[in-house]
């Protein structure tokens, strides 16, 4: 577990590391040891020249031996390029026995059962892709594999040859010790004279390979290459094999937007040709490959927007103007210019496929010295601004997080300073306020706010990192040995073992005061590995204490400071990082009145440019925050005073008694204060980010920044632009944006130049489409597919670890999972990983990397298994080969088998139970296997036998484990050996550390774990935490950091130790052969969840609680349909897009990115403070379980407290919450420590935006129900993935609905709370070491950060206020829900949409809204609305989004609807929130668990005595207390006249969910429809007439629905009674749907109802299915979501009887509106339902006809016209749809999103419009942002109003309207055209244009082109609100 990310598992950390700067494939090199290649399978060091290598004594010695034995010379050495091409093109591949490849091939071909691979592949693919049943057969899979094998034969054979040779090379130490070769291959022998392995490669080719040199004899020539060149070439052939094989598979699978094999070969050939011609210099061209490809994508940007879209491409090409390399760049450019961005991105990851250059180490040193020698004189004005900007960012962010400002001192008090007044009164600083003066920050000085934790000591940053000897040590080494190499002085671990105890608090204080001792001021530099730069990029090794200083201070920044700079991504978890990349990249696709572009900044040697005077403005502030002003400023002083030397051995170094190494100016030098790679990344990043935000401030643009090190990507958003109807920027706006971008770019270059951190102008590029961050590419907001880089690095063998079969298969699994993250789906990866697993299994038998060191490869003869509690030796034969291979391809490490990964787990991260995952996968896989014998073998992999020993330590360390009979092997073996070494080591001179290591005693540890698991039932997740919090867990954590190190392994790994490991591995392989010969102890049930519980119960002999979770592939059945019906299932509704476009376009749905499960309550303030201490972290976190998992005072709670008492003398009181403050189920919310808790998709999630999912429809298991063992994230991921791949593979599909229904009735069970009587272990004490500073901390030594002090004081103050307990007061759920809703309205609390729906289901809407409204009004009456304005009203819409809510609140508050739909919810007129007459007498309570306690207290005062609101003195007192967030002495918050000392409101502390969820669901009863309550009144409904020849429309007042709905009720009822209707189509309008439902209920009829659903709402919930739940149960099955491709016949007809008296006989075509059915009942005819409608009313065209069938009635929203109108026959050819008489302007292009105007022709109607404007403006003013943004938003709303006025105005309407809203408009509206376009694609629009041209040439209008306007706000928003 990484201390920076304690909550992430290693797998997630691997992915996160690939995202973060400085972590991408970096490895440290340990001096010259890397050259001997011992145990290495891949290149890990930079490639050196012959001259540099000869400076290493080890290599020089080996070369001298090779000269004698083989006659080699410098001239016969192959370059690294020659070596690579020899491996790629000239590998001797003889198939004859007695040659290496022939021996290998012969042995592989005898193993057999290769056909099983094909069967397993097809079956695994079909587990999630059953639609591929006919395409994926074993024969088809075999055909595809054979094609891929044939096309990649050369690479496959060469890779196999060289990996075999390298593996044999690694046997040399063991074979030399043994004196013989253990391999019985005729082609391999040990040459005892030279010590080399002799390999017969071909008829005339012999290869001799040693630890450092490989000699190739092909008569008559002798060539040789250093081993590093060989490793480089072997890596490249393996990488090319992987990518070519994968591309070939993708070709056959027809993966869209792929790089085909032919394309790939062309790309690789260009690079190869370049290297052949240019040699090592060709890597300069190869190094430009990435920039070229990014430049090609950038060239596709909008030329009218981006000032120089060719910049990156052009500068890349110009760099090689006079170089032969240019032609190769041109070839690539031509090649890629015709490819899609997805294809380019995929090829982008191939930049290392051509190998690596020979580095110029001296050139790298000179370049480093050249940059470092530049004197920096940054402009003082820039430094001053940076200092101010740092304070602004830190103070505002600190206040946002903690609600108070950091400790500071005002140096010079200024009158009327906005900043100083805000700091004084603790008010939020708005940097856009008019009175904000940036220079006032000079008057503010930060004080100490953060402490260095006392328990930070030697072990806090203990890692296996190479270090430099100090000056004295290196002086002695050079003087005595003539070399700088000495392992004891170069490993940090050994230093830690031998050093005295160091408390970092004192250590850092000493550095702050006096600096570092001179003896420690030394830095070694070495060339970074696997780079493409010829001039070496140098990394640094520091002395132990210098490293301790740098690492500790960086850790302080990471732990304490970075959270206040959210722009920095270095400390973000994986999911947050991914979401932020999506957010920043997607801004480029916005089509509103703004435009966003992406800047990629490229600094020139960012680290080396840093100096003390550059960093001082930030570093001095950082130091002051820790009370040590010089702490960070010492960085560059220390660098300046340090001796810097080349530590990799190539330099000529001489000893110096002062410096350690004589500073000759070439290989060693001093006086260099420049920054060094990787030593102060976080500090320098903060400086860079502060400077960028300073520049952004000057240009008034919004900035989204992602920064880590020198990799800075920022999106700048320019507002105030105008777009045409196609969404493109008009010319003027494009010019404005170009100017802004150009000015911003120039300012970036100038400011950073003035600071001394120059940007590379030629590569600081801008794009409006391409976003790149750490190799992740997004194009127009969509992540690009790019799996090839990860594919290329899928290797079974890895450096620096023991190569067991389990490790090799895990390496494959990790690589495949990393590749899947960049891939669309896992189908081609199933091929890759299954074939790779088979190869590993073959290699383990033929040439095992470990066991062949000591024994000849043979099949095992006997294997040991356990049955019925007894060990049994089982004879094995070749007959078990098939079983062995199968276990290696489908096994699970949880079952004791090699850890393969299967498709259902490949596509997600975070599923908590690997046992049920494996068992359910096997149960799904077996039926799909074609071969019955193979199916039987696979089924047996799910069987288990029980170990005869019960080691509870294994269960506690891994709570999901089972006690199987597999033997220990591999890393488990070496882990214990290393612990034994540490316990007995004499190296540990530190007595405290040595004392800790005594806890590693096996027997003592076993006794502890046995006692911990002594209860009747095992609550194993809790036991895991208890053990982790104990000293056993703490010590094991330290040991795990040590025993994974190369250093300690080297101390252990003598040949004897390695032989023990090899023996363990041989036993394990024999076990795999023997495992399934005899019947197992336990076999699976039909349900995997039941099986897993049984396995755990019987293997551990006790019931294991809380870890078994059913997997969705067995628990749920996924089905699909093209018609939507209500189902008790998780539902996924797709849009109408299918085929490859779903991968390259963004839908309107919300992308599902998964989620981490968060705990629903926080630790106490004191627990949060103490949790900073290393020793206490786990024990303090454990205390949260009291009253959550176990009640306070219970026996188990006492053990939980005991864990804390064992390591501190602090009282355990105050470390846990009271029971009423806790919410959230433990089993769901608390993950196993170190693992992901939640679930994240592990594939490109773009296609999920084309679907809308909900779990609310799963009524049996939805929110508010029972606590069950369901992992909802995995259910959603499984459902979305299946739907996504199905739709992506089949173009032309209609919209579909996918259901994930419960399939297995046994999977889902209730989670039962544990009983302490059965789960409490018999544990009386925990290990404790009070006198050991590593293991115990006294409370007096715990110093709290300032914000913790404030929070604890505040918490104590609030605790003193408590006077009530939940259950002991009259508090109702309505009161509490009203408080929550109020806090949401003012933006103080965020609540999920699903919880709001739960509130809606449990609490009556009217009293709930009243409870919130009371508080809103009292805030206004107290004058606190300036501090707490209404910020967000979306919660109102969601709470009232039911027929009950609409009806109740319309009657109660006069609430008006702007609209309402099932998918998007309702949209209310929220102006009622500003009506003070709604206030009702009440007495408000206070909940200390919620936010804004001072405000709650103030409202309680006002509610108990309304006179307080009228008293100016009371209001002034209250405002002062609330603004300062005071809570003490709250009873005296009134003036003397109104003071009441007995004032005592209900004050409690309780989690709101406990109150709200305790309520039962509201009984819905009859269906409610607004305005349709009294049936009798309906017959008298007024019908409105209209003259369509005039544009004077009827007045639709606020009672619009009161007129319409009754008429629709009558119409609908009459139709159902009179006509044989088959179905009803209803617009997605909440009131109309409920009306139809009510009619059906009243008539007791069922009929198919089709709801015309719109586009996805993009919310986290799926509203329509929540609304289906509200319908009467017998109607649910009749409701269908109507999609655009699933309509009833548009020409559906209705049978009508003839009647000569019909008023419609005089015409053939009639325009019908909703109330005319009664008049047309006797007319022959049919109703034409338009295929595309422009009306918002129920309308159709009646065609009088004597041919008729059954009709479908269509009912739509917002009916405006109610009489029939005969249609002139001459228009009928253009009139296939009714005309729209709706004059509401389409204002979306004008920025009026969310506003719908009512129609009006009088001042009375205008008042409705104004009320809506007021509501919109109040929402804007409630969340204003900066002043400019607020002004722009107001102008948008008012602009839309003005346009509406202009179009509707008659006579003096414009003047009246202007006066009413106090807005003047100057200028004119120009280029205004009619709404209907004669050239439009839509026939409807063309028909309307003809009609309007004839009937109404002057209206209606919409702005189509540029809009010239000047809108002046003559009053503030509060005036507009009346």
Curated annotation (Swiss-Prot):
Q: What is its EC number?
A: 2.7.7.48, 3.6.1.-, 2.7.7.88, 2.1.1.375
UniProt cross-references to Pfam families, sorted A to Z: Mononeg_mRNAcap (PF14318), Mononeg_RNA_pol (PF00946)
Assembly and partners are described as: May form homodimer. Interacts with the P protein.
- Which keywords belong to this entry? ATP-binding, Host cytoplasm, Hydrolase, Methyltransferase, mRNA capping, mRNA processing, Multifunctional enzyme, Nucleotide-binding, Nucleotidyltransferase, RNA-directed RNA polymerase, S-adenosyl-L-methionine, Transferase, Viral RNA replication, Virion
> What exactly does this protein do?
RNA-directed RNA polymerase that catalyzes the transcription of viral mRNAs, their capping and polyadenylation. The template is composed of the viral RNA tightly encapsidated by the nucleoprotein (N). The viral polymerase binds to the genomic RNA at the 3' leader promoter, and transcribes subsequently all viral mRNAs with a decreasing efficiency. The first gene is the most transcribed, and the last the least transcribed. The viral phosphoprotein acts as a processivity factor. Capping is concomitant with initiation of mRNA transcription.
RdRp catalytic domain: which residues? 595-781
What InterPro entries does its record include? Mononeg_mRNAcap, Mononeg_RNA_pol_cat
What the record says about family reads: Belongs to the rhabdoviridae protein L family.
GO terms for cellular component:
host cell cytoplasm; virion component
- Please write the reaction equations for the catalytic activity of this protein: RNA(n) + a ribonucleoside 5'-triphosphate = RNA(n+1) + diphosphate; a 5'-end (5'-triphosphoguanosine)-adenylyl-adenylyl-cytidylyl-adenosine in mRNA + 2 S-adenosyl-L-methionine = a 5'-end (N(7)-methyl 5'-triphosphoguanosine)-(2'-O-methyladenylyl)-adenylyl-cytidylyl-adenosine in mRNA + 2 S-adenosyl-L-homocysteine + H(+); a 5'-end (5'-triphosphoguanosine)-adenylyl-adenylyl-cytidylyl-adenosine in mRNA + S-adenosyl-L-methionine = a 5'-end (5'-triphosphoguanosine)-(2'-O-methyladenylyl)-adenylyl-cytidylyl-adenosine in mRNA + S-adenosyl-L-homocysteine + H(+); a 5'-end triphospho-adenylyl-adenylyl-cytidylyl-adenosine in mRNA + GDP + H(+) = a 5'-end (5'-triphosphoguanosine)-adenylyl-adenylyl-cytidylyl-adenosine in mRNA + diphosphate
Localization terms from the record: Virion; Host cytoplasm
Put simply, this protein is called RNA-directed RNA polymerase L
Molecular function (Gene Ontology), one example? mRNA 5'-cap (guanine-N7-)-methyltransferase activity
């Amino acid at each position: 577990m990484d201390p920076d990310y304690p909550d992430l598992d290693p797998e997630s950390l691997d992915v996160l590391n690939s995202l973060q700067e400085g972590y991408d494939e970096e490895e440290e090199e340990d001096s010259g040891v890397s050259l001997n290649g011992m145990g290495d399978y891949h290149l890990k060091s930079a490639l050196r020249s012959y001259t540099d290598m000869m400076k290493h004594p080890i290599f020089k010695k080996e070369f001298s031996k090779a000269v004698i034995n083989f006659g080699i010379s410098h001239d016969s050495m192959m370059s690294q390029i020659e070596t690579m091409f020899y491996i790629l093109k000239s590998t001797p591949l003889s198939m004859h026995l007695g040659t290496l490849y022939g021996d290998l091939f012969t042995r592989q071909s005898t193993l057999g059962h290769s056909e099983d691979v094909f069967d397993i592949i097809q079956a695994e693919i079909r587990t999630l892709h059953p639609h591929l049943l006919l395409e994926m057969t074993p024969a088809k899979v075999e055909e595809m594999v054979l094609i891929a094998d044939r096309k990649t034969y050369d690479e496959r054979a060469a890779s196999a040859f060289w990996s075999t040779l390298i593996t044999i090379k690694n046997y040399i130490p063991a074979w030399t010790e043994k004196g013989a070769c253990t391999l019985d291959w005729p082609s391999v022998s040990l040459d005892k004279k030279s010590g080399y392995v002799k390999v017969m490669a071909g008829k005339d080719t012999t290869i001799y390979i040693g630890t450092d040199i490989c000699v190739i004899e092909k008569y008559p020539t002798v060539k040789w290459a250093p081993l590093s060149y060989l490793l480089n070439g072997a890596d490249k052939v393996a990488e090319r094999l992987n990518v070519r094989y994968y591309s070939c598979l993708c070709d056959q699978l027809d993966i869209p937007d792929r790089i085909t094999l032919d394309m790939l070969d062309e790309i690789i050939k260009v690079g190869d040709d370049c290297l052949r011609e240019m040699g090592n210099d060709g890597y300069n061209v190869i190094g430009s490959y990435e920039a070229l490809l990014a430049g090609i994508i950038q060239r596709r940007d909008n030329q009218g927007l981006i000032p120089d879209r060719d910049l990156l491409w052009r500068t890349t090409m110009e760099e090689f103007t006079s170089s032969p390399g240019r032609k190769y760049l041109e070839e690539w450019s031509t090649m890629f210019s015709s490819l899609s961005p997805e294809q380019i991105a995929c090829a982008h990851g191939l930049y290392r496929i051509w190998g690596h250059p020979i580095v110029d180490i001296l050139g790298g040193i000179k370049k480093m010295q050249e940059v470092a020698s530049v004197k920096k004189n940054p402009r003082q004005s820039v430094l001053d601004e940076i200092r101010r900007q740092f304070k602004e960012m830190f103070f505002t962010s600190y206040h946002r997080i903690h609600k108070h400002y950091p400790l500071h001192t005002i140096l010079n008090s200024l009158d009327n300073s906005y900043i100083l007044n805000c700091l004084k009164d603790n008010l939020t600083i708005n940097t856009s306020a008019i009175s904000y003066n940036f220079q006032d920050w000079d008057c503010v000085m930060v004080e100490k706010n953060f402490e260095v934790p006392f328990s930070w000591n030697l072990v806090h940053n203990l890692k296996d990192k190479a270090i430099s000897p100090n000056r004295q040590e290196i002086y002695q080494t050079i003087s005595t040995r003539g070399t700088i190499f000495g392992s004891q002085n170069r490993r940090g671990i050994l230093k830690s073992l031998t050093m005295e105890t160091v408390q970092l608090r004192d250590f850092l204080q000493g550095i702050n005061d006096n600096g570092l001792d001179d003896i420690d001021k030394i830095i070694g530099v070495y060339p970074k590995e696997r780079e493409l730069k010829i001039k070496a990029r140098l990394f640094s090794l520091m002395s132990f204490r210098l490293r301790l200083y740098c690492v500790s201070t960086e850790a302080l920044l990471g732990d304490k400071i970075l959270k206040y700079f959210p722009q920095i991504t270095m400390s973000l978890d994986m999911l947050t990082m991914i979401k932020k990349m999506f957010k920043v990249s997607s801004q480029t696709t916005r089509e509103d009145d703004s435009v966003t572009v992406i800047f990629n900044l490229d600094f020139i040697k960012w680290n080396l440019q840093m100096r003390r005077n550059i960093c001082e403005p930030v570093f001095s502030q950082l130091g002051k925050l820790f009370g040590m002003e010089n702490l960070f400023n010492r960085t560059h002083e220390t660098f300046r005073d340090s001796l810097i030397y080349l530590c990799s051995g190539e330099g000529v170094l001489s000893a110096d008694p002062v410096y350690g190494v004589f500073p000759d100016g070439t290989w060693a030098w001093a006086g260099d204060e420049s920054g060094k790679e990787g030593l102060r990344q976080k500090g320098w990043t903060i400086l860079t980010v502060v400077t960028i935000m300073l520049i952004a401030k000057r240009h008034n643009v919004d900035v989204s920044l992602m920064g880590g090190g020198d990799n800075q990507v920022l999106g700048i958003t320019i507002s105030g632009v105008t777009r045409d109807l196609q969404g493109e920027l008009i010319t003027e706006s494009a010019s404005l944006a170009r100017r802004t971008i150009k000015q911003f770019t120039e300012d970036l270059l100038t400011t950073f130049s003035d600071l001394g951190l120059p940007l590379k102008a030629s590569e600081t590029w801008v794009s409006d489409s391409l976003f790149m961050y750490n190799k992740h590419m997004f194009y127009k907001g969509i992540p690009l597919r790019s799996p090839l880089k990860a594919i290329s690095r899928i290797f079974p063998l890895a450096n620096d670890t023991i190569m067991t079969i389990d490790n090799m298969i895990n390496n494959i699994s990790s690589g495949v999972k990393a590749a899947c993250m960049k891939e669309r789906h896992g189908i081609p990866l199933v091929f890759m990983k299954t074939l790779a697993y088979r190869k590993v299994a073959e290699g383990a038998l033929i040439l095992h990397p470990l066991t062949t060191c000591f024994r000849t490869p043979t099949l095992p003869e006997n294997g040991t298994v356990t049955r019925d509690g007894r060990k049994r030796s089982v004879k094995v034969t070749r007959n078990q080969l098939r079983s062995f291979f199968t276990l290696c391809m489908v096994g699970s490490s949880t079952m004791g088998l090699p850890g393969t990964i299967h498709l259902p787990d490949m596509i997600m991260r975070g599923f908590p139970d690997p046992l049920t995952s494996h068992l359910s996968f096997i149960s799904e896989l077996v039926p799909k296997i074609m071969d019955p014998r193979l199916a039987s073998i696979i089924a047996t992999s799910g069987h288990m036998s029980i170990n005869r020993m019960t080691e509870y330590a294994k269960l506690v360390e891994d709570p999901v484990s089972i006690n199987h009979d597999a033997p220990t092997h591999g890393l488990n073996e070496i882990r214990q050996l290393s612990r034994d070494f540490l316990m007995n080591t004499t190296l540990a001179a530190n007595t405290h550390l040595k004392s800790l290591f005594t806890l590693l005693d096996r027997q003592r540890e076993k006794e502890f774990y046995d006692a911990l698991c002594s209860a009747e039932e095992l609550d194993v997740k809790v036991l895991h935490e208890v053990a982790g919090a104990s000293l056993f867990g703490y010590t094991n954590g330290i040991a795990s950091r040590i025993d994974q190190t190369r250093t300690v392994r080297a101390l252990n790994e003598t040949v004897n130790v390695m032989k023990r490991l090899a023996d363990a591995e041989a036993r394990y392989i024999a076990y795999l052969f023997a495992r399934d010969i005899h019947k197992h102890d336990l076999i699976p049930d039909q349900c995997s969840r039941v099986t897993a519980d049984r396995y755990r119960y019987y293997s551990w002999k006790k019931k294991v609680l809380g870890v078994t979770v059913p997997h969705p592939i067995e628990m749920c059945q996924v089905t699909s349909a093209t018609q939507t019906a209500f189902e008790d299932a998780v539902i996924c509704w797709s849009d109408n897009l299918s085929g490859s476009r779903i991968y390259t376009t963004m839908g309107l749905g919300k992308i599902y990115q998964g989620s981490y499960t968060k705990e629903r309550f926080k630790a106490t303030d004191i627990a949060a403070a103490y949790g900073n201490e290393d020793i206490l972290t786990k024990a303090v976190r454990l205390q949260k379980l009291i009253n959550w998992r176990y009640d306070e005072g219970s026996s188990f709670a006492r053990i939980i407290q005991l864990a804390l008492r064992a390591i501190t003398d602090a009282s355990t009181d105050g470390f846990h919450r009271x029971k009423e403050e806790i919410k959230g189920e433990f089993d769901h919310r608390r993950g196993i420590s170190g693992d992901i808790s939640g679930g994240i998709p592990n594939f490109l999630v773009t296609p999920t935006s084309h679907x809308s999912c909900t779990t609310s429809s799963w009524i049996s298991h939805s929110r508010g129900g029972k606590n069950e063992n369901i992992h909802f994230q995995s259910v959603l991921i499984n459902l979305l993935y299946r739907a996504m791949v199905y739709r992506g593979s089949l173009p032309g599909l209609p919209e579909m609905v996918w259901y994930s229904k419960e399939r297995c009735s046994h999977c889902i069970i209730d989670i039962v709370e544990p009983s302490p009587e059965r789960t409490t272990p018999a544990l009386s004490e925990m290990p404790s070491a009070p006198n050991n500073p590593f293991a115990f901390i006294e409370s007096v030594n715990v110093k709290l950060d300032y914000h913790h002090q404030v929070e604890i004081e505040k918490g104590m103050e609030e605790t003193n206020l408590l006077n009530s307990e939940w259950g002991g007061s009259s508090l109702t759920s309505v009161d509490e829900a009203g408080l929550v809703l109020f806090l949401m309205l003012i933006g103080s609390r965020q609540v999920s949409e699903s919880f709001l729906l739960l509130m809606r289901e449990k609490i009556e809407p009217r009293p709930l809204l009243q409870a919130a409204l009371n508080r809103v009004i009292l805030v206004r009456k107290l004058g606190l609305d300036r501090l707490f304005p209404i910020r967000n009203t979306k919660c109102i819409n969601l709470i009232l989004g039911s027929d009950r809510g609409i009806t109740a609140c319309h009657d109660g508050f006069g609430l008006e609807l702007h609209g309402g739909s099932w998918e998007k919810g309702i949209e209310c007129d929220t102006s009622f929130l500003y009506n003070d007459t709604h206030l009702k007498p009440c007495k408000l309570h206070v909940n200390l668990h919620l936010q804004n306690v001072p405000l709650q207290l103030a409202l309680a005062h006002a509610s108990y005595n309304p006179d307080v609101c009228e008293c100016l003195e009371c209001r002034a007192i209250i405002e002062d207390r609330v603004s300062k967030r005071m809570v003490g002495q709250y009873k005296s918050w009134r003036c003397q006249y109104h003071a009441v000392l007995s004032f005592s409101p209900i004050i409690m502390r309780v989690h709101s969910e406990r109150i709200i969820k305790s309520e039962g669901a509201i009984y819905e009863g009859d269906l409610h429809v607004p305005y349709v309550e009294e049936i009798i009144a309906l017959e008298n409904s007024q019908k409105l007439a209209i003259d369509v020849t005039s544009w004077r429309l009827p007045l639709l007042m606020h009672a619009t629905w009161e007129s319409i709905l009754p008429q629709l009720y009558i119409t609908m009822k009459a139709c159902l009674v009179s006509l044989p209707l088959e179905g009803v189509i209803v617009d997605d309008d909440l009131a109309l749907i409920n009306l139809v439902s009510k009619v059906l209920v009243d008539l007791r009829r069922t009929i198919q109802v089709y709801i015309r659903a719109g586009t996805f709402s993009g919310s986290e919930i799926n509203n329509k299915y929540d609304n289906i739940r509200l319908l009467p149960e017998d109607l649910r099955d009749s409701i269908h979501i109507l999609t655009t491709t699933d309509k009833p016949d548009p020409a559906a007809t209705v049978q009508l009887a003839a009647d000569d008296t019909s008023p419609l006989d005089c015409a053939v075509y009639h325009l019908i509106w909703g109330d005319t059915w009664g008049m047309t009942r006797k007319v022959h005819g049919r109703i034409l339902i338009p295929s595309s409608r422009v009306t918002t009313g129920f309308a159709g065209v009646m065609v009088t006809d004597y041919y008729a069938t059954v009709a479908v009635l269509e009912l739509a929203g917002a009916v405006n016209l109610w009489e029939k109108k005969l249609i002139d026959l001459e228009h009928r050819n253009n009139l296939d749809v009714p005309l729209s008489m709706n004059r509401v302007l389409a204002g979306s292009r004008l920025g009026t999103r969310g506003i719908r105007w009512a129609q009006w022709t009088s001042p009375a109607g205008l008042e409705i419009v104004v009320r809506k404007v007021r509501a919109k403006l109040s929402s804007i003013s409630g969340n204003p942002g900066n002043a400019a943004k607020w002004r722009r938003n107001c102008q948008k709303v008012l602009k839309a109003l003005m346009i509406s006025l202009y179009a509707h105005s008659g006579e003096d309407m414009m003047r009246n309207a202007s006066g009413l809203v106090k807005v003047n408009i100057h200028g004119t509206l120009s280029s205004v055209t009619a709404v209907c376009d004669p050239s439009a694609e839509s026939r409807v629009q063309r028909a309307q244009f003809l009609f309007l041209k004839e009937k109404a040439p002057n209206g209606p209008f919409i702005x189509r082109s540029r809009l010239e306007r000047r809108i002046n706000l003559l009053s503030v928003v509060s005036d507009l609100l009346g």
